[in-house]
């Protein structure tokens, strides 16, 4: 693996599914990144146990424990993979020490970032929000349509395996819908957005599936299809398991429909169906929702370190 001569040490706050998957990605694939600490609140968590076995500094005392670790002085980036409710305090403590924060909760204190859309535009922000797993999967498709047509309304449905949703994800369900809906508008380009999440209890667990429905002005359908395929390729650069389930579908809506928050609109309905297969770094391949979130966060951190937006340590010191 190609590793650069200087790397940024990172801390991961949250030793659940997302935090553990992210830790494994940093350890296996980090080019500009080095694991500095894994932080949790449950001493018996699998994530903390794995971190210890892999030689990563750990604490079960939350952010306060992280601040007390001797390794903290070298941390340049902290990933928060806890909950929206806890993030505000975590962010305040970390910002006070000059640590760049990548927020994997729906708290959305900082600007929304989806790497395929707006990564480079937000590198100077002290806190970057990764929206949600459903947002990372679907908002690129809304943006793909909005760059060739005015989007009146966009609705997404994210279906994930219940087994892939840990306590943190379940605690964030309400924030998931609110944050994803808003991000569909802010970076997806829709006048109005709506998000729905489904925790699928099927056994064996099913791969992450996402449906995206967009109502836009009438434009050339080939232009939309080409834009969608180009965007899929952009996401695949950091999430190889991201793909179209079938060809993009179109339907002309001639009779105006009343869209709450928008009013009466007609136009072209574009339906996009996706699936996201995980890399199986921690949970099996059905957990594409973990993989797209952690891969997006890793992509952001790598770019921050590469562009010198965070403190790094020379290779002799790491």
UniProtKB/Swiss-Prot annotation:
Matching InterPro entries: Acetaldehyde_dehydrogenase, Acetylaldehyde_DH_C, NAD(P)-bd_dom_sf, Semialdehyde_DH_NAD-bd
Residues bound to NAD(+): 15-18, 164-172, 289
Keyword annotations from UniProtKB, A to Z: Aromatic hydrocarbons catabolism, NAD, Oxidoreductase
EC number(s) stated in the UniProt entry for this protein: 1.2.1.10
Highest taxon in the source lineage: Bacteria
Pfam family, one: Semialdhyde_dh
Catalytic residues (UniProt): 133
Keyword Oxidoreductase annotated: yes
GO molecular function: acetaldehyde dehydrogenase (acetylating) activity; NAD binding
Catalytic activity: acetaldehyde + NAD(+) + CoA = acetyl-CoA + NADH + H(+)
SMART domains: Semialdhyde_dh
GO biological process: catabolic process
Family to which this protein belongs: Belongs to the acetaldehyde dehydrogenase family.
NCBIfam families for this protein: ac_ald_DH_ac, PRK08300.1
The name this protein goes by in its record: Acetaldehyde dehydrogenase 1
Species name: Azotobacter vinelandii (strain DJ / ATCC BAA-1303)
Organism lineage: Bacteria, Pseudomonadati, Pseudomonadota, Gammaproteobacteria, Pseudomonadales
